[in-house]
Each structure stands twice: as structure tokens, then as C-alpha cells.
């Protein structure tokens, strides 16, 4: 059998362009949408076939008689269904037993049956300015029965003298612990205290006479007093005597 290449081959298609992506305004939302779409399609429908690009094959024309035209005896040809059945031996269909219902677990406790302590009403009780108790009514200290049972009412005969103290707005109840032994039955102290020393009758401080000498006024020669006591005549005479002395001294020097 001879094969002859056709003289007019078909024109080969252009190679596909590479995927360059798609411009979208919000890429994150687009990716999430595509991912959800792929997961829904993959879960619902059959897997899609992937087609890869391939080069086209050259076509050839037959010249001689084809070998497929030969007569084949009908006895040798078997049906496809019987041939496949002969290849694989199918097992006999087994009888299916009905599934028994599941037995419930004895120790299983329903979540709804469990009473959560925090699902009930919560109460807040301030204990002090920086501490507050939060919990159900069974946890908090204020309950229907009073906690302080042995409190006597205050007598109105003796009014309080001191100023009233302003307590906090929400004061927590105080628990009173009774003293088992009364104060009258307490034993007296065995220690004997010495009495204090008697005070001295006499004066404790001795007064000593101190004599302070008076300052003696000394008569000092004050030049101002001497000048004030002299008269003007005496002053003029003293000046003249001093002048004559100076003149006599100068004349004696020049005559020498």
C-alpha cells in the first residue's frame, strides 16, 4: 500500500497566545469568587477535560485497496458486551443486610441538659471600692436570711458626740463573730505595776542672784566740747601766735 502526501496541505493555525490575565478593579474579591465557583463546579459536575494545543498532522490519501475491506467471517466476530463479560468475572450479587440502628451511648450527656452556671442571671455585689464580686445569686453573700443575727439596737439615751463618718454608697455586710467568753470572766493580769514616784514638794529650780555691773561713764576729752568752751578771742590769739612764729622762722633763715 502506497501513501501519497497531498499537494495542498491545510494551513496550520496560528499558535495560541499566552494567557496575560484579566484586569479587574478588586482582585481579592475576584479571586474569592473564582475560587468559590471552582469548588462548587468541582463538587457538583464531572471534572472538565483539559485540551492541550498540538501540532496538526499531515493528511495522506490512499492509492491502493484498503486492508480493512477484506471479508471477515462472522463467526470470529463476537459481540463487545459478551467479550467484556468474558474478560472480567463478575461476582454473584450478595444479599444486603439492613443496617441496625445505632445504640445510644449511655454516658453521653446532652449539652442542653447541662446547666451552665453562667447562663443564669448574674448579679454584681461591690465589696470595697476596688473589689467587686460578680456571679449568680447563690455565690453572692446577700441572701434572704440575714448574716448578722446578734446585733443589739443602739441605745438612744447616749447620743454620739463625734462626727458622723460618711461611708461608701454600697457598703458590704459585715459578718459578726461572737466572743465565746464574756469580758467579766477574763483572768486579771498577774503583773503588778509600781506606783509612780511622789512629786517633790520643794521648788525644783534654784534661783541664783546675778549682779550685772552697770557701765561706768568715763569722761573722755572730746575736742568738740573743748572747742565749744573756748571763746572767739582765744581762738584769734592762738592763730596770731602761730602766724608770728612762722614769720620769725622765715626771717631768720633769709638773714643767715
Curated annotation (Swiss-Prot):
The record's account of how the chain is modified after translation: Ubiquitinated; mediated by SIAH1 or SIAH2 and leading to its subsequent proteasomal degradation.
Where is it predominantly found? nucleus
> Does the keyword Chloroplast feature in the UniProt annotation?
no
| Stretches for region Disordered | 1-24
CC terms in the record's Gene Ontology section: RNA polymerase II transcription regulator complex
Q: What happens when the gene is disrupted?
A: Mutants show severely reduced or absent germinal center B cells in the lung-draining lymphatic nodes when infected by influenza virus.
UniProt keywords (A-Z) are: Activator, Nucleus, Transcription, Transcription regulation, Ubl conjugation
Choose any GO biological process term that the UniProt entry carries and state it: cellular response to virus
Q: Which domain of life is it from?
A: Eukaryota
Which GO terms label this protein's molecular function in UniProt?
Answer: DNA binding; POU domain binding; transcription coactivator activity
List the subcellular locations: Nucleus
Report the residue ranges that make up the OCA domain in this protein: 16-38
**In which family does this protein belong, per the annotation?**
Belongs to the POU2AF family.
Job of this protein: Transcriptional coactivator that specifically associates with either POU2F1/OCT1 or POU2F2/OCT2. It boosts the POU2F1/OCT1 mediated promoter activity and to a lesser extent, that of POU2F2/OCT2. It recognizes the POU domains of POU2F1/OCT1 and POU2F2/OCT2. It is essential for the response of B-cells to antigens and required for the formation of germinal centers. Regulates IL6 expression in B cells as POU2F2/OCT2 coactivator.
Q: How does it assemble?
A: Interacts with POU2F1/OCT1 and POU2F2/OCT2; the interaction increases POU2F1 and POU2F2 transactivation activity.
Q: Which PANTHER family does the entry link to?
A: POU DOMAIN CLASS 2-ASSOCIATING FACTOR 1 (PTHR15363:SF3)
Instruction: List the protein's name.
Output: POU domain class 2-associating factor 1
Species whose genome carries this gene? Mus musculus (Mouse)
Amino acid at each position: 500500500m502506497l501513501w501519497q502526501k497531498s499537494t495542498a496541505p491545510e494551513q496550520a493555525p496560528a499558535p495560541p497566545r499566552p494567557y496575560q490575565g484579566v484586569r479587574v478593579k478588586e482582585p481579592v474579591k475576584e479571586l474569592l469568587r473564582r475560587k468559590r465557583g471552582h469548588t462548587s463546579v468541582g463538587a457538583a459536575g464531572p471534572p472538565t477535560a483539559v485540551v492541550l494545543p498540538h501540532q496538526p498532522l499531515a493528511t495522506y490519501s490512499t492509492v491502493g485497496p484498503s486492508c480493512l475491506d477484506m471479508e471477515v467471517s462472522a463467526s470470529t466476530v463476537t459481540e463487545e458486551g459478551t467479550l467484556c463479560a468474558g474478560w472480567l468475572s463478575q461476582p454473584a450479587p450478595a444479599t444486603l443486610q439492613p443496617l441496625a440502628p445505632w445504640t445510644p451511648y449511655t454516658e453521653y450527656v446532652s449539652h442542653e441538659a447541662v446547666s451552665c452556671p453562667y447562663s443564669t442571671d448574674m448579679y454584681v455585689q461591690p465589696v470595697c471600692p476596688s473589689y467587686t464580686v460578680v456571679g449568680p445569686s447563690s455565690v453572692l453573700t446577700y441572701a434572704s436570711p440575714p448574716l448578722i443575727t446578734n446585733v443589739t439596737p443602739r441605745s438612744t439615751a447616749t447620743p454620739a458626740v463625734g462626727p458622723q463618718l460618711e461611708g461608701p454608697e454600697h457598703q458590704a455586710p459585715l459578718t459578726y463573730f461572737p466572743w465565746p467568753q464574756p469580758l467579766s470572766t477574763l483572768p486579771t493580769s498577774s503583773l503588778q505595776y509600781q506606783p509612780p514616784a511622789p512629786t517633790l514638794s520643794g521648788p525644783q529650780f534654784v534661783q541664783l542672784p546675778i549682779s550685772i555691773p552697770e557701765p561706768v561713764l568715763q569722761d573722755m576729752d572730746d575736742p568738740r566740747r573743748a572747742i565749744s568752751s573756748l571763746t572767739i578771742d582765744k581762738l584769734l590769739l592762738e592763730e596770731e601766735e602761730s602766724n608770728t612764729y612762722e614769720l620769725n622762722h622765715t626771717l631768720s633763715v633769709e638773714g643767715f
